[in-house]
From Swiss-Prot:
Family: Belongs to the TFS-II family.
Keywords from the named record: Late protein, Metal-binding, Transcription, Transcription regulation, Zinc, Zinc-finger
Name of the protein in its database record: Transcription factor TFIIS homolog
GO BP terms, alphabetized: DNA-templated transcription
All copies of domain TFIIS central, residue ranges: 77-201
Protein purpose: Putative initiation factor. Necessary for efficient transcription elongation past template-encoded arresting sites.
Example of a GO MF term: nucleic acid binding
Amino acid sequence: MKMHIARDSIVFLLNKHLQNTILTNKIEQECFLQADTPKKYLQYIKPFLINCMTKNITTDLVMKDSKRLEPYIILEMRDIIQMMFFRTLQKHIFFKKHTDLCTEYAQKIEASCYHYTYQQQEKTFLEEYSTRCGTINHIINCEKKSHQQQDNDALNKLISGELKPEAIGSMTFAELCPSAALKEKTEITLRSQQKVAEKTSQLYKCPNCKQRMCTYREVQTRALDEPSTIFCTCKKCGHEFIG
């Protein structure tokens, strides 16, 4: 009973300064769920009370004191990330026509990234979570550069229902973009297998000593549909240049 009264009082104090009932309830509930005793609950909620009363709750403060204020920054960040996914999905005409579905998918995609990150924990949670969300957001963006549009497997499968939004967060790049992953793997394999044997030719003039005694080799440094790059070495002065 005492704990219930204390929680009501804390909610009242927080909301008085934040003027945001939803955010107030989120902060208080997160602190309550993380605490297993009334003492720990008060330890978790104390920083919020102090900073609210002094009007010092800011993003900068949260980052400097991320351990104690982590519930606050995570809740705020998740809302921002969900909006980011919503705006990205709405760029596609399908989601422009289905706003409710767009909202649902944005929330589920963010949640899948959140749960995936929570299980990893190799880096700090916020850093890993932010990185993961940025990667997924790029993958589902329909406004990619022209040469990337054909590789948007994930967005097409999301629209068709083949891919569930709640599963995206834990999937690998190869699972989300099989076409792009296969293309990348093929290019890497081709480059590793290409012949780099040097040949001698008088076709290339050394810009250093002006002689035409050079060895050269062709290397596929760009996309497969673009010409190879020719690396030349002057046999006279040893200068290296691109032919």
